[in-house]
Amino acid sequence: MIKEILLLHHSHTDIGYTSPQPVIFELHKRYIEEAIELAEKNASNEPNCQFKWTCEVTGMTMDWWKNTTPQYRKRFLKLHHKGLIDVAGCKWHMTPLMDHQMII
C-alpha cells in the first residue's frame, strides 16, 4: 500500500529551444513571481512543508531583476534570506558537446 507520495516541481531552462527567446523570458518571469507568491503563502508552515524555489540559471533571474518592480525585489530578497528562494550559480546551461573553442 502506498503511504506517501512526494511531489517535486521541476523546470528546465532551454533558452530558445522549446520556444522563441522572448517567450522563454516571459515564462520565467511568471515562474519567479509565482514562486514568490507560493513561498510567501507557505512561509509559516513547518520547514518540511514550505515551498522552496531555486532559479535554475542566473541569466533569467538577472533579466527578471532588471525588469521587475522594487517591491518584487524586496520580497525576493526577504525570501532568499529565509532560505526559501535561491539562485543557481550558472548564467546559462551549456551543452556538454561544446569544446573549449565554442565556449570562448
Give short role names for the model-derived ranges.
Residues M1-I104:
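Carbohydrate-active enzymes and regulators
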